[in-house]
Each structure stands twice: as structure tokens, then as C-alpha cells.
Amino acid sequence: MNNIFKGLITAIITPFRDNKLDLNALEKILEYQINAEVNAVVIAGSTGEGSSLSFEEYKLLLQTAKDIVNKRIPVISGCSSNNTACAIELAAESTKIGVDGFMISPPSYLKPTQGGIYKHFEAIHEASNLPIMLYSVPSRTGVDFTDETILKLSKLSRILALKDAGIDLERPLRIKSVINKELNLLCGNDDLSLAFNAQGGVGCVSVASNITPKLCKELQEKWHNNDVKGALGIHQRLLPLYKALFVESNPIPVKYAMYYLGFCTNEIRLPLTEATDTTKKQIEEIITSLSIKV
């Protein structure tokens, strides 16, 4: 099975207008990513406010994204839920639509044991036939995979990657030392992506690449082509943007940045609220300093 989880993967925002999906804006956003030659996109993940969508909106968003992309790059659907049956349903609907893979985090709020986390993913795996990227994001879920659970899950044939949005930079080395199969490790934090790659990572699932996909793609390419100095130069240039995108809860700052660049409205769904004036000013200054052209 081809491993689609590598390189630069953009976690796409979901644009709204008058509290409805703005599908015209979605097309502009996706074409911007495709023109920058990103390796794949994630739809309806954390950055895409997936948990704030109705099931009908989720289906419409995925179908529209799949139609726009039209097989030019892989489309990965966020299928996370704290209800295993619902996660299976999201994966089943995604499969019908024709996505290329899933990104799934452990169930939030319920605080399952490691045994429960394993069974949750095993059930989704057995009910589907597409590749899965595990998504470690303990700051949101309240639980995380242990190394032992990752090792156990990696033995399931279609679990091919781990997106790690934690801060344990020793983890890639530990995992690589005990897992025999190809399990691609991707960083979920833009600001840590180079350090993560240095420990065995193969790419980044990025928020910042919504805004500047060409630079983010160039950074990953330079690193993997052993141009460490070039990659570090881009990383240092983008570091203020990385930091600004998390001064408030993601995706609040990135949604404003995309509005400022002219892609969409600044609408974001409750319980999230739009960026403060201080954050807006910071984002505007950074975008201006980067001379981003769209």
C-alpha cells in the first residue's frame, strides 16, 4: 500500500459565510495549495473545525474538496470522534466519497485506557480499507498513545503513519528503534518540524502552510535534500508566523490570516471566537514582512 503520509501536508481551514460552508472560498484555498505542490491536504481536522460541523456539512465539505482536487493530490479526512461508532461512520462516509486516507486522534474527554484506545482504532481499522494516520494531540484529547500502544497499533496493516503534535522530541527515535514496518512519523507542530525531522520524521502536517505553502514546501524539500542550512534559513524566517498562529486557540489566528489574504471571511464557529485586535495586528505585520503573494 502506497504511503501517502509524507512531506508537506496542509491541515486546511474550513471557510464559512453566513454560518454556512463557503464552497467557493474552499476552491480558492485548495487551488492555492495544489499550485504550491503540497503533498496532501487534511479536510475537517482540528484546523478545519471538524468537530463543529454537522454530519451533512462534513459530507458536503469532503465531497466538494474531493471534486475540486480531482486526484491531483491525496485528500485525507479527519475522522476523529469520542464515539467509536461515530468514528466508523465518518470513515465509512469518507470512503464512499473517495478520500485517500484518514487522520484520527484518540477519543477525547472520556479518558480511555491504553487498551480502550487500541480497541477504538482496531475497530475503525477493521471496518475500513483505507490507510490511517494516527494523530497524537494530547493538549486537545487529554490522553495520548504510549510508545507500546503505537507499536501494537503499527502491526495493523493499514496504520501507516503517526502525526505527533506533542513536544517529546525523543519519541521518533524511540519508535523507530522498536518498529520494524514503515511507519511514517510527521510533526504536528510547525515550529518543531525541523527538530522532529532530525529525529527521524518524514514531514509535517502544517497549519502555517495554509498561508505560505510554497515556503513550507521548500523548507521540507531542502531538509530532505540535505540542505540543512537552507531549511534552517526558511525556518527562522517563518518562526514568528509559527508562534503567532498559536497565540490563541488554533484555528482562530490562521482563519484571520486567510481572511486578511483575501481567501475567505473571518467567520469561525462557537465556542471559538474571532481573533483579538492584538492578534490581528500581529498577523498582519508578519504577513507583510513575509511579502506573501497570492
From Swiss-Prot:
Keywords: Amino-acid biosynthesis, Cytoplasm, Diaminopimelate biosynthesis, Lyase, Lysine biosynthesis, Schiff base. The keyword Lyase applies. The active site is at 135 (proton donor/acceptor), 163 (schiff-base intermediate with substrate). InterPro entries: Aldolase_TIM (IPR013785), DapA (IPR005263), DapA-like (IPR002220), Schiff_base-form_aldolases_AS (IPR020625), Schiff_base-form_aldolases_CS (IPR020624). Gene3D superfamilies: Aldolase class I (3.20.20.70). Coiled coil: none annotated. It is found in: Cytoplasm. The record marks 46, 109 as: Part of a proton relay during catalysis. It catalyses: L-aspartate 4-semialdehyde + pyruvate = (2S,4S)-4-hydroxy-2,3,4,5-tetrahydrodipicolinate + H2O + H(+). Pathway: Amino-acid biosynthesis; L-lysine biosynthesis via DAP pathway; (S)-tetrahydrodipicolinate from L-aspartate: step 3/4. Pfam families: DHDPS. Signal peptide: none annotated. NCBIfam families: dapA. Belongs to the DapA family. Homotetramer; dimer of dimers. HAMAP family: DapA. This is 4-hydroxy-tetrahydrodipicolinate synthase. The lineage of its organism: Bacteria, Pseudomonadati, Pseudomonadota, Alphaproteobacteria, Rickettsiales.
